[in-house]
Amino acid sequence: MGERKGQNFYYPPDFNYKTHKSLNGYHGTHALRERAKKIDQGILVIRFEMPFNIWCLGCHNHVGMGVRYNAEKKKIGMYYTTPLHEFRMKCHLCDNYYVIRTDPKNFDYELVEGCSRQELRFDPTDIAQIGAVDRGFTQKLAADAMFKKEHEAEDKDKAATEEGRVDKLEWIQERMRDDFTANSFLRAQFRNEKKSLNETRARDANLRDKLSIGTTQLLPETEEDRRIASMMTRYRDTKTHDDHLESSRDRIESRRIFRRPEETDTPSTSSGSSGGAVPSASERLKATMKAERDKRINASFSTAGTSSATQKLLGIKRKSASSLGVQIKKAAPENSSLQDEEPAVEKPNISNPISLIAQEYGNSSDDSD
């Protein structure tokens, strides 16, 4: 359809080429539309970009370089064969208008009305830029030998100052002269960096899948992260004082109250294993089950006023006082005197009843085992 764009114009019956010239002339419009609303006055609306920093004289605000305005552009004269243009625009912060003209003689702009320049001018030679060529100075150097002699010393000093800079530029050019080698070296660096980035992305993706954290962005590792991770791995089994106390209580509670002296807390290992060998899974399970059973037994003994049903369940037999060899002394009458008091009966040398019960319970439990 591109070839038909120039043919899809409708020309009405009263259109006359000699009178209207074009469809825009027939409709009384311009090809630039709103930009040419003052074209009869020689004014064209353009987008003007501020060439330097200025101060608005109406609101005293700062307008930075590069700010763009809709400006009215018109031709006001000629400098030799170069036209002089004037730009008029409205401040975007107040009702003030700026008027700026071109100055081809000084390669600059002239601020006519509404604004003032922020003085930040530099000598082109100070900022490593080529300044404007003064043709009169060049012609005077060629025509006046004394004037040229006066400036030879300045040229020599400048050459000595810029010698190091010129050598550096030559070294850079020499280094980049073999473009194939430089390109190969640069591409090799890019390949290594790309490989490293792909490995990092794959490692991060595996970690995100393992932790189920979706598309969370992971930050790169740092030396501080590695140091903290090594400390966590090194001290992960370190326990506090409270942890040691709690483990000691658990070990004591899981220890049988009534046990033989040759029994130990640690589970026995297989006959073929050495003394420092790690117990197998079955041995650890047996030790855990035994510790839980001992805890239940100790808890039943620690409760006061054990019921008869619990005593029967544990295999405890209550013995009478006569069977233990204990003789109960009757109370003396109130009217008896201290001289008539009978001597105290010596208690038989027997072991503690609790030890007897424990011995009996231990024998019964060993038999059950």
UniProtKB/Swiss-Prot annotation:
Family per similarity comment: Belongs to the CWC16 family.
Biased composition (Low complexity): 266-282, 299-310
Domain of life: Eukaryota
InterPro entries: Saf4/Yju2
UniProt xrefs under Pfam families: Saf4_Yju2 (PF04502)
Chain segments carrying region Disordered: 233-369
Biased composition (Basic and acidic residues): 233-263, 283-297
Annotated Gene Ontology cellular component terms: post-mRNA release spliceosomal complex; U2-type spliceosomal complex
GO BP annotations, alphabetical order: mRNA splicing, via spliceosome; RNA splicing
TM ranges: none
Protein name as annotated: Coiled-coil domain-containing protein 130 homolog
Species, as recorded: Caenorhabditis elegans
Positions of disulphide bridges: none
